[in-house]
Amino acid sequence: MGIRHELDILLVSENLALKNVELLKGDSYGCTINIKVNQQKKLDFIIILRPDWTEVRNVKKINMVCNGVVIDTTLIKKSFYEEVYSSSVTVFQNTTVEFFSDTSKKYKEEYPIVNINTIKRYYEIKDSRMTCINFESPISDYDQVNYLKDYINISDDYYLYDACDDCIISSDHDDNDNADDDEEDDDEVNDIEDDYE
């Protein structure tokens, strides 16, 4: 059947969870996140790896690169069932954040690519590649209780969101606005793609 790790990435500062980021099969995991900002912004990440021990004895460390600069990831919990990392970075411009366990082009070409627009507060999966990536916004109560409360050194503002005002919506979300608004949103999606091509 092959190795099947599980990888989730919580973008805590945007109340967004990237779920099932792992490859469908293989001892490699990672993704590329293009983030659009219009001002200085602190991005807080929690990375949750649930290893598949059927065919491996050790798991690979998760590396993080932001606009070509290596960022430290801190291992904050390790058990038989999961490894949890945290990382924070402050950005001043549109940013590309990469998470990866392997630097080989063979694997990196299979990692998913997502775009997150923090200005308009929506996301899109640009290319899911060899994954079944999906999103949750807001971050689920389960993830908040298990990962945010004890494992991240950030303000209580992030813990247990009461409303969906802080949610990020999918770029294909139908909010029944007029066609002009839809065209404006489409332009924004194209803008974020243009910034990274």
Curated annotation (Swiss-Prot):
Chain spans, region Disordered: 172-197
TM annotation in the entry: none
Domain of life according to the entry: Viruses
Coiled coil start-end: none
Biased composition (Acidic residues): 174-197
Pfam families: Pox_C7_F8A
GO BP of this protein: viral process
Entry keyword set: Early protein
Family to which this protein belongs: Belongs to the poxviridae C7 protein family.
Identification of the protein by name: Probable host range protein 2
Organism this protein belongs to: Sheeppox virus (strain KS-1) (SPPV)
Classification lineage: Viruses, Varidnaviria, Bamfordvirae, Nucleocytoviricota, Pokkesviricetes
